[in-house]
């Protein structure tokens, strides 16, 4: 990554929705309305069974297909799990890690860290999700809580690998609720995240890393 230039990235996922057939139809339509030019990267992260259909549909476009989760192990007796090398071979470029819905099912900061390192070893770009609950926000400890998640997620990662990652700030209280953080709230937390990245990896790497906001986004509030 050119650390003197931070290219915009737009990423989305549709959770446990759409069959492979529906994915193909959606992607075919999306190609007709996708942003033109090269001012940003676009990532679409889909359920595992939809990855082949998405990759085929987006072949010869600049849209990167990703997965919504992976296992930290390279192989083994982990029934139902998917390894980073499998996702890479299937055509993925990105993987979402630490989404609040995964954390709600017991995924820990340590789990997220193991997955981050597995993906970087497998040449995939992690999209590392962090965010606070409404209780944490009401306590006034949002920045400390989120920065602790960032620090834990990147433990043992060096600056060169960190520069390949994307951080997604997703306040839990704004996911699927119709509520969104104000621009000021989002900017404050994203600034705190970047400051924490600077502590971990230095100012140059921190400024190069891309930070997203997610939570009840729609065409009416994206700007």
Show the residue positions of the predicted features.
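Active-site loop-to-helix "anion-binding N-cap" substructures in soluble metabolic enzymes
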Residues: 1-223
């Amino acid at each position: 990554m050119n650390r003197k230039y931070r290219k915009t990235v737009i990423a989305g996922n549709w959770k446990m929705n759409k069959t492979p057939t529906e994915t193909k139809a959606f992607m075919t339509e999306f190609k007709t309305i996708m942003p033109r030019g090269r001012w940003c990267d676009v990532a679409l992260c889909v359920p595992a069974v939809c990855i082949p259909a998405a990759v085929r549909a987006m072949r010869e476009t600049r849209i990167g297909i990703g997965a919504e989760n992976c296992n930290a192990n390279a192989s083994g007796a982990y029934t139902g799990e998917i390894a980073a090398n499998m996702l890479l071979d299937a055509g993925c470029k990105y993987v979402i890690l630490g989404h609040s819905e995964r954390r709600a099912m017991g995924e820990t900061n340590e789990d997220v860290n193991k997955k981050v390192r597995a993906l970087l070893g497998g040449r995939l770009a992690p999209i590392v999700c962090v965010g606070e609950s409404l209780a944490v926000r009401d306590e006034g400890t949002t920045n400390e809580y989120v920065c602790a998640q960032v620090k834990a997620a990147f433990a043992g990662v060096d600056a060169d690998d960190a520069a390949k990652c994307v951080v997604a700030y997703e306040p839990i209280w704004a996911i699927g609720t119709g509520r969104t953080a104000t621009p000021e709230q989002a900017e404050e937390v994203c600034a705190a995240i970047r400051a924490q990245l600077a502590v971990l990896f230095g100012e140059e790497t921190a400024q190069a890393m891309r930070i997203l906001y997610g939570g009840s986004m729609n065409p009416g509030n994206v700007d």
